[in-house]
Amino acid sequence: MPCTQCGDTVVYRHHVCEVAALRENYFEGKDYLELRALFENSLKLFVAVDEATPDNLRPIMSKRAALALIDSIVDADTIDENALKPDAPTPTLLERRMKEEYDKRLRTFAPEDLVPIMKSVHERTVRRVDSGRRITATDKKYFDLAEGLLCDELAVSLAVPRENVKDVLVERVKRAEALRR
């Protein structure tokens, strides 16, 4: 029996969902959770109860945890490109290693692993713009994905409309930066 109940809000892989139902003997004699994605109206997901492990299904973070995560953004590390360079002697190989690092962090489904992706892409983009170049397609893809995942979960955790989450993030991060000075 799952530790979740109908009506619970959970994160399943890359989706914030409500547990809509427990379907007993739904497929091949297994019990399944029916999940309704909150930000993708027509998406329903079915997860075998015995496969609903903490690796891919977890409760939504609490409001306290969400605020603590936002407050930690100022001091959060970026992905250390210099540590990746010995294995990536060319710019193309470095881009590939960065993509692998982004993928590795996304696979954890942990909100605290999304922040370094976003901070790294932001720093890389600033450097590129300063040298007359644009954001890479890979960086844009992973930034948008990480931002979407984080904002979806924060919207529910903080009970804030999805479209206002970025404003809440920016305001709170600026406040945290001001306190550091």
What are these model-derived regions, one by one?
Residues 55-181:
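Charge/polar-rich, low-complexity and marginally structured segments
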